């Protein structure tokens, strides 16, 4: 039992799955690049007990984004969108009856670099920023691991 307790204390989690990257000026940054579908993003959003800043978007694998509408409107304060699916995600979220009262801000960017810098500028002490794409990375990266590593490098260079 002692060894199980030790493993639990020292387990750092799985890379790219709600992986803590670092804290900068009171803002915590997480890499959830493996969240390549709305259901995985929703699971990630439910892991936090506050409204988040979320970076999302990527390759369009022709899946519906309507399941994101309610959880995003309830759990996200700033949604930073990029990639081929930005229009579809924004449409799904803004067509929700929850959107007008949610206070959600939506920002469009062209690159992950721009997304990270935008999140840094908009974040306040106590905020959480997470890369939770809801999409595969094939429009910009060979796989979710490459996207996640790039995100971590960008955050660590801030």
Language model features with spans:
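Nucleotide phosphate-binding/pyrophosphate-handling subdomain across enzymes
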Residues: 1-76
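Short, solvent-exposed loop/turn segments at secondary-structure boundaries
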Residues: 141-144
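Short glycine-rich, flexible loops that bind phosphorylated cofactors or substrates
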Residues: 88, 135-139
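C-terminal helical cap/extension that packs against the catalytic core
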Residues: 68-126
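Glycine- and other small-residue-rich loops at beta-strand/loop junctions that grip anionic moieties
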Residues: 32-33, 57-58, 82, 107, ...
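Short beta-strands and strand-loop turn motifs
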Residues: 130-134
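Phosphate-binding loop of NTP-binding sites
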Residues: 121, 150-158
């Amino acid at each position: 039992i002692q060894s199980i307790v030790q493993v639990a204390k020292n387990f750092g989690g799985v890379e790219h799955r709600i992986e803590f990257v670092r804290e900068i000026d009171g803002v915590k940054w997480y890499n959830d690049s493996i969240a390549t579908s709305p259901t995985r993003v929703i699971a990630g959003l439910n892991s936090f007990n506050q409204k988040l800043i979320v970076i999302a978007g990527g390759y369009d694998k022709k899946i519906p984004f309507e399941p994101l509408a309610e959880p995003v409107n309830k759990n996200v304060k700033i949604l930073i969108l990029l990639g081929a699916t930005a229009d579809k995600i924004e449409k799904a979220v803004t067509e929700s009856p929850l959107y007008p009262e949610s206070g959600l801000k939506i920002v469009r960017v062209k690159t992950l670099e721009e997304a990270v810098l935008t999140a840094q500028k908009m974040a306040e002490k106590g905020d959480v920023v997470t890369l939770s794409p809801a999409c595969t990375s094939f429009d910009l990266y060979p796989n979710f691991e490459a996207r996640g590593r790039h995100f971590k490098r960008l955050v660590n260079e801030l």
